Curated annotation (Swiss-Prot):
Gene Ontology CC: one annotated term: ribonucleoprotein complex
Subunit record text: Part of the 50S ribosomal subunit. Contacts protein L20.
Organism: Prochlorococcus marinus (strain MIT 9215)
Family: Belongs to the bacterial ribosomal protein bL21 family.
Superkingdom of origin organism: Bacteria
The keyword Phosphoprotein appears for this protein: no
PANTHER family linked: 50S RIBOSOMAL PROTEIN L21, LARGE RIBOSOMAL SUBUNIT PROTEIN BL21M
Biased composition (Basic and acidic residues): 128-147
Protein name in the entry: Large ribosomal subunit protein bL21
InterPro entries documented for this protein: bL21-like, bL21-like_sf, Ribosomal_bL21, Ribosomal_bL21_CS
GO biological process terms held by the UniProt record: translation
Keywords annotated in UniProt: Ribonucleoprotein, Ribosomal protein, RNA-binding, rRNA-binding
Summary of the function given for this chain in its UniProt record: This protein binds to 23S rRNA in the presence of protein L20.
NCBIfam families xrefs: L21
């Protein structure tokens, strides 16, 4: 019994830093030093990629939810390889007709490894007031006067 409690505590420690980000129209839960298969990216192996669309970020102390994205948060990925997923068979048949069609599809994937999850410090807003610009009052142009 005590071992199971320790293992549950260890699993919580593994999730001290994670981020949920959007890439290729899908949302992924990213953790540092883990591999993920995402839709094919136009990048070569060993290239570095940065994701800016971070929806949620959790570190040791807090959870930050973006509106819609977390400001100044980035995830750095490294492309490990390009591969193809297993084949998915699609079978179409029209009843009472002699029409049958069997097709297959293999999704193109890119395997990436998360190198780091970074949160930039927000820039402090200056307390100086904006200078108000005063428009000069211009007289409306009158129509040509006839003499």
């Amino acid at each position: 019994m005590t071992n199971s409690k320790k293992s549950s505590n260890n699993s919580l420690k593994n999730h001290e830093l994670y981020a949920i980000a959007e890439t290729s129209g899908q949302q992924f839960w990213f953790e540092v030093n883990r591999y993920y298969d995402i839709d094919r990216l136009k990048a070569k192996e060993k290239d570095k990629i940065t994701l800016d669309k971070v929806l949620l970020l959790k570190d040791k102390d807090s959870i930050t939810v973006g509106k819609p994205y977390v400001k100044d948060a980035k995830i750095e990925l490294e492309v490990v390889s390009h591969k193809r997923d297993k084949k998915i068979l699609v079978y179409k048949m029209r009843p009472k007709k002699k029409t049958r069609r069997k097709m297959g599809h293999r999704q193109e994937l890119t395997r990436v490894m998360v190198k780091s999850i970074k949160v930039g410090k927000p820039t402090p807003k200056s307390s100086s007031k904006k200078e108000e610009t005063v428009k000069k009052e211009t007289k409306p142009k009158s129509e040509k006067s006839t003499n």
